[in-house]
Amino acid sequence: CGMTAEELSRLTDPYFTDGRKHKERPAGLGIPFLGQAVEQSGGTFGIDSVPGKGTEVHFAFPLSHVDTPPFGDIAGLLLQIFIFDGEYEVVVRRTVRTAAGSDSYCIRRSECREALGDVYDGVSVQLLKKFFTSQESGITVTQAVKR
């Protein structure tokens, strides 16, 4: 639960893994891939970790890159992150920015599962997909991971 300063400093190295999460894999490509994709799209990316408490990964994509490279189908990717089984929380914040200011709201994985039931259900997946593909705003994701 949480990472040491050394682990955190090597987190974006695709050839580094602590060996705890996936003992059979010699490399961890998820975070390095995410960081590069966010950077290429002009978004923001950050990681906060406290040993004994947990790790939070924050990233935001500009609306102009929701369905273009480097991701292509960001809505589908976020849906996969949302329904992936395990002990973690995902918070997706939708923000609408106009000349007059901005408004935002959040959807949390835990609240969604409670409200919609099994997110593998077809109706639940369609509701999530609609949320992730709405063209009204940009998408910011915070994923709190318990290790």
Q: Language model features by range: what are they?
A:
Residues 3-15:
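Short conserved segment of the HATPase_c
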Residues 16-26:
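Glycine-rich ATP-lid/hinge loop adjacent to the conserved G-boxes
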Residues 30:
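Gly/Ala-rich beta-loop-alpha elbow adjacent to hydrolase catalytic centers
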Residues 33-43:
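Conserved glycine-/histidine-rich ATP-lid loop and adjacent helix of the Bergerat-fold HATPase_c
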Residues 47-51:
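A short beta-strand-to-loop motif within the catalytic HATPase_c
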Residues 53-55:
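Glycine-rich GHKL/ HATPase_c ATP-binding element in histidine kinases
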Residues 58-59:
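HATPase_c (GHKL) ATP-binding subdomain of two-component histidine kinases
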Residues 63-147:
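N-terminal assembly/transducer modules of large multi-domain enzymes
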